[in-house]
Amino acid sequence: MSSNTSAPSLNALAGPLVESLVADAAKLRLIVAQENGARTVDAGANARGSIEAGRRIAEICLGGLGTVTIAPIGPVASWPYTVVVHSADPVLACLGSQYAGWSLADEEGDSGFFALGSGPGRAVAVVEELYKELGYRDNATTTALVLESGSAPPASVVNKVAAATGLAPENVTFIYAPTQSLAGSTQVVARVLEVALHKAHTVGFDLHKILDGIGSAPLSPPHPDFIQAMGRTNDAIIYGGRVQLFVDADDADAKQLAEQIPSTTSADHGAPFAEIFSRVNGDFYKIDGALFSPAEAIVTSVKTGKSFRGGRLEPQLVDASFV
């Protein structure tokens, strides 16, 4: 259970989803193993993986507090298959679990391993300052982390996570897939709602006023090249993503949030992400952080019933990225 008695346990909700993923490994084309004392699930490195695996991994990332579906219709006509994400507790699901906020690197060996950890394991370790703002900590006997990586974590990373969570390595499951894979690209696009929550947090909106949220973005086709694959998943959200947040706020605050969330607020908006990445010579820190947002936002005030819009879809840029 969580230390906040009014909030659900992310790990209690996500645990059955993890076990179901493992049980269905064969039909989802996954490889389950024991490595460095922990259970690992390869969803796209040496395993072929699948879109369905990516969909289910995204629900694990959300800590069991959200649903992820693939819909046959979407806002970008030429790419109709759409990842739809919904959560009745989007702050905890997206920021408390799905956000890839835990930096994990091999600091003892020479593997060069680095990945950002997302999922309910973050809420057990609470190594990020964000959890002080959320006022949340989860207690669990087993946990899981999702890594955007082409390899399993080395022993030093497994031990680091075990120490931070207070759990033995055998009680931690690492699910990993590179962005180039079917599962990897799907679970990244499923972050369309999460980036809106992150932007709301960045601009200082009161997170307690966000009641519900839904988002969608076109399912990006995978690409064998990492830069192109990363570009496509980002472009799906930046130029094809749409979110609607329901807030307990007055019209002025709702309108301002709708205007602040979209990627159009970024000076880097207007070109495919791979092109932007090349322009800054691969230095993420030179990219305006405001770009990592959905293309369009709708914010509805439950106090007044009025809805406000900001941003715009850019289907031509989605096309330029996906073809």
From Swiss-Prot:
It is found in: Cytoplasm. Pathway: One-carbon metabolism; formaldehyde degradation; formate from formaldehyde (H(4)MPT route): step 3/5. SUPFAM superfamilies: Methenyltetrahydromethanopterin cyclohydrolase (SSF56199). Belongs to the MCH family. Requires salt for optimal activity. The lineage of its organism: Bacteria, Pseudomonadati, Pseudomonadota, Alphaproteobacteria, Hyphomicrobiales. One of its GO terms (biological process) is one-carbon metabolic process. Keywords: Cytoplasm, Hydrolase, One-carbon metabolism. One of its GO terms (cellular component) is cytoplasm. Optimum pH is 8.5. This is Methenyltetrahydromethanopterin cyclohydrolase. Homodimer. The keyword Cytoplasm applies. GO terms for molecular function: methenyltetrahydromethanopterin cyclohydrolase activity. It catalyses: 5,10-methenyl-5,6,7,8-tetrahydromethanopterin + H2O = N(5)-formyl-5,6,7,8-tetrahydromethanopterin + H(+). InterPro entries: METHMP_CycHdrlase (IPR003209). The gene is mch. Its EC number is 3.5.4.27. CDD domains: MCH (cd00545). Catalyzes the hydrolysis of methenyl-H(4)MPT(+) to 5-formyl-H(4)MPT. Coiled coil: none annotated. Optimum temperature is 40 degrees Celsius.
